[in-house]
């Protein structure tokens, strides 16, 4: 491996940071030797209605997997994110909304946020929503998305947010699985100057015969665009809140009461409803936000993630607001209307902490200094990366160009399932290596195991697992605990399997090497290959399909589809477009294949299993050593695929 450049800890940052290297090591040791004592102390980072006496009650044992933290305590998330700040910072901005159009913005103080959340909480109650009911959000990136989330938590409803880029079919599937009672949406969203037909998509989803649980749809007027109206079902947000009281007492919730369901892509078809509960999740999101971003009084924090992803939950809304921070919520994209938009927003709002994705960084990097044209970015103090491993070249560009070589970069590794950041540098404590997520956060116990599950010590490469629980860990898959155990705990007994590969270097730093299961990472969004394959095979002209990921300069991975057509069907430019449009409709634009490879046959073992390893190598042009092909039923298929590869559209 080439020489790795090490960036020492920035001493100016270290002087005021919450922890230095020595303190990190000491706290980390405490957290793994005595997790009970450590989390008893740090569980106090949030306000409890009824204090907990029990801290950790967890098991990774096969057949008995159970995760419970602070299980006899009670609290309310909304009260922790808003009410507890009113006496000390009521007039401080809580949310700064920056519209898609650079002239569009709005600020909500903690007092104003409190009023809006209480009103919308009462509006939800007036539409029949009660504690424990599931509410589905399909929203644009507007402040009302955060208000709706906080209102759900205030009254004890469970929210499930579906990213606004998902299709009506994908939305319907998630509504059915979660048994949601009400949908919150907008007439339209706005993204890069284009309208997104959210209400129409909801109407289409609810027309699906399998969707039977939805009673009401609350619609926010974002653009004023024309929408179909179902008067017995649809309610305008502004009308529902106009008559609502601005007082709403927060519901007392048990630490293990469900907080939200968030669907993530599985390697076996149907998306999985990851369940996070109230106490452990909030403690972990609050604590990681404070330490990972070294949050200090007066910081303005901007996370560019959509609320529809876990990063938007933990580090756009809950983590920042629980810490009393000012969080920027951005409707647009980092390169619209110009390549320098991200830098312009930093200057406009004096952003001091920026958290974005390698995809955005690579897209801006391709434009060189255009990304910083006419901006100073002098307010920046800390920068972060999330969503996928960042390649060293992009890390260096982000550091030198966006951050003027001044700002530490926290390259964070975590998942929807983990609730919060697991492996990360801390700004005042960790020397940085571009491309490495570095060291585990407090209480996090990673290990690297070989394919037999043997723990590898020292410098090693293999499968990344966690050997013990942490408060932010998911509790189960909604309605399917068996699948939860099967997915995460059956591969390596007694350990949580992340699905990622990693290597550990001589300094104990972790480097994430990518997925080892059949899940793609497209622009930081996880997509199951099986979900895309299922959509393709549902197309009436396709007999069989296999999906692999190939490297992509901007998106990290592109989608490469091998397709076998039904007898009598002939590949054509028209069919090529039909297939892409079909996947876009079934799942959403993000799942659209970048490459279609028409073929008569796929490489299969004698037992009928598709050999994806070989398909990956062919797709990436790495055909020099295909490894063991002795189990192939028909080895000639491989040569044919290699020849066909030359003509891929």
Curated annotation (Swiss-Prot):
GO terms for biological process: acetyl-CoA biosynthetic process from acetate. It is an enzyme of class 6 (ligase). It catalyses: acetate + ATP + CoA = acetyl-CoA + AMP + diphosphate. The modification N6-acetyllysine is found at residue 609. It comes from the Bacteria. CoA binds at residues 191-194, 311, 335, 523, 584. One of its GO terms (molecular function) is ATP binding. Its cofactor is Mg(2+). ATP binds at residues 387-389, 411-416, 500, 515, 526. One of its GO terms (cellular component) is cytosol. Its EC number is 6.2.1.1. Acetylated. Deacetylation by the SIR2-homolog deacetylase activates the enzyme. NCBIfam families: Ac_CoA_lig_AcsA, PRK00174.1. Belongs to the ATP-dependent AMP-binding enzyme family. Catalyzes the conversion of acetate into acetyl-CoA (AcCoA), an essential intermediate at the junction of anabolic and catabolic pathways. AcsA undergoes a two-step reaction. In the first half reaction, AcsA combines acetate with ATP to form acetyl-adenylate (AcAMP) intermediate. In the second half reaction, it can then transfer the acetyl group from AcAMP to the sulfhydryl group of CoA, forming the product AcCoA. This is Acetyl-coenzyme A synthetase. It comes from Photobacterium profundum (strain SS9).
């Amino acid at each position: 491996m080439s020489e790795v450049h090490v960036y020492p800890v920035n001493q100016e940052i270290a002087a005021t940071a919450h922890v230095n290297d020595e303190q990190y090591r000491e706290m980390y040791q405490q957290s793994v030797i005595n997790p009970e004592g450590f989390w008893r102390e740090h569980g106090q980072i949030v306000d409890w209605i009824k204090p907990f006496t029990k801290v950790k009650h967890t098991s990774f044992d096969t057949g008995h997997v159970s995760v419970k933290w602070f299980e006899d305590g009670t609290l309310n998330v909304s009260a922790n994110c808003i009410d507890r700040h009113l006496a000390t910072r009521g007039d401080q901005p809580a949310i700064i909304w920056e519209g898609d159009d650079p002239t569009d913005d709005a600020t909500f103080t903690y007092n104003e946020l409190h009023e809006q959340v209480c009103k919308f909480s009462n509006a939800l109650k007036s539409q029949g929503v009660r504690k424990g009911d599931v509410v589905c959000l399909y929203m644009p990136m507007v402040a009302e998305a955060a208000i709706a989330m906080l209102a759900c938590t205030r009254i004890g409803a469970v929210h499930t947010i579906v990213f606004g880029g998902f299709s009506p079919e994908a939305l319907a599937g998630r509504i059915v699985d979660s048994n949601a009672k009400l949908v919150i949406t907008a007439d339209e969203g706005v993204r890069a100057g284009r309208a997104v037909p959210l209400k129409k998509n909801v109407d289409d989803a609810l027309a699906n015969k399998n969707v039977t649980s939805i009673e009401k749809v609350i619609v926010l007027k974002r653009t004023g665009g024309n929408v179909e109206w179902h008067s017995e079902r649809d309610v305008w947000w502004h009308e529902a809140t106009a008559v609502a009281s601005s007082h709403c007492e927060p519901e007392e919730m048990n630490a293990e009461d469900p907080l939200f369901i968030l669907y993530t892509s599985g390697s076996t078809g149907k998306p999985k409803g990851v369940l996070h509960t109230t106490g452990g999740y909030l403690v972990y999101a609050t604590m990681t936000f404070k330490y990972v971003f070294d949050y200090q009084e007066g910081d303005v924090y901007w996370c560019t993630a959509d609320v529809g992803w876990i990063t938007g939950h933990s580090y756009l809304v809950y983590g920042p607001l629980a810490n009393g921070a000012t969080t920027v919520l951005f409707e647009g994209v980092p390169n619209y209307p110009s390549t320098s938009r991200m830098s312009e927003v930093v200057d406009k709002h004096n952003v001091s902490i920026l958290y974005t994705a390698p995809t955005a960084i690579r897209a801006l990097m391709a434009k060189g200094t255009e990304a910083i044209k006419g901006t100073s970015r002098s307010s920046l103090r800390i920068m972060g990366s999330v969503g996928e491993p960042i390649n060293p070249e992009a890390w260096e560009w982000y550091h030198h160009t966006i951050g003027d070589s001044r700002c530490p970069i926290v390259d964070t590794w975590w998942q929807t399932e983990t609730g919060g950041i697991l492996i990360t540098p801390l700004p005042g404590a960790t020397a940085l290596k571009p491309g490495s997520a570095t060291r585990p956060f407090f209480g996090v116990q990673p290990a690297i195991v070989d394919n037999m599950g043997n723990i590898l010590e020292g410098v090693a490469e293999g499968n990344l697992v966690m050997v013990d629980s942490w408060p932010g860990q998911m509790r189960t898959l909604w309605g399917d605990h068996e699948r939860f155990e099967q997915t995460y705990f059956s591969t390596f007994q007694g350990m949580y399997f992340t699905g990622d590969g990693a290597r550990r270097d001589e300094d104990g730093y972790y480097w994430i090497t990518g997925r080892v299961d059949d899940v793609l990472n497209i622009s930081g969004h996880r997509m199951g290959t099986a979900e895309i394959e299922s959509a393709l095979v549902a197309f009436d002209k396709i007999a069989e399909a296999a999906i692999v990921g190939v490297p992509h300069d901007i998106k990290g991975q592109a989608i490469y589809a091998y397709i076998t057509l039904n007898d009598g069907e002939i590949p054509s430019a028209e069919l090529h477009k039909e297939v892409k449009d079909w996947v876009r409709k079934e799942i959403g634009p993000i799942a659209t294949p970048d490459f279609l490879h028409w073929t008569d046959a796929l490489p299969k073992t004698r037992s009928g299993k598709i050999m994806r390893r070989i398909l990956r190598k062919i797709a990436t042009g790495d055909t020099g050593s295909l490894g063991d092909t002795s189990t192939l039923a028909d080895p000639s298929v491989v040569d044919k695929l290699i020849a066909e590869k030359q003509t891929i559209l």
